[in-house]
Amino acid sequence: MADNDNEDVIMDDLVEEYVETEEENFVDSEEESEDKSEDKDEIVESPSICEGFVQASSQTLVIIPDNERITSNVLTTFEATRLVAVRAQQLAINGSTMLKKKYSSPIDIAKQELFNRKIPLLVMRCIKVTPEGQKIVEIWNPREMGIPLLD
């Protein structure tokens, strides 16, 4: 995991979905708003920043070791699309490409980086949030995962 410290991380809550209702969005002037950022997907720059982010939201990040992972080693279509979107956004603001061949658009470059297994991003899958406030996650490198076909 030490060689991936400079790579971006995408958090994806696969197990627990968060559904907001109008009542949950309403905040009375006397009440304080609860921090709901723990249940939403977040994009952060590196795992170390991610740890700071999760600790700032009163949670501790627990990373499952690679040999004890419980989720599938195949990217979901959502994860693959999100990886391409995040990478295309980076490339659109003058990010450097990992490919030698020239492509016309950031989306094409991001797709080729994903399919060539050169995309410099990580996928963080939230497994569970314990009552004690610990967030149990798996960090996957897309280079070691199966990739679905994208149009």
UniProtKB/Swiss-Prot annotation:
Residues 20-44 have a biased composition (Acidic residues). The keyword Transcription applies. GO terms for cellular component: DNA-directed RNA polymerase complex; host cell cytoplasm; virion component. It is found in: Host cytoplasm; Virion. SUPFAM superfamilies: RPB6/omega subunit-like. Keywords: DNA-directed RNA polymerase, Host cytoplasm, Transcription, Virion. The keyword NAD does not apply. One of its GO terms (biological process) is transcription by RNA polymerase II. Residues 20-46 are annotated as: Disordered. PANTHER family: DNA-DIRECTED RNA POLYMERASE SUBUNIT K, RNA POLYMERASE SUBUNIT, PUTATIVE-RELATED. This is DNA-directed RNA polymerase RPB6 homolog.
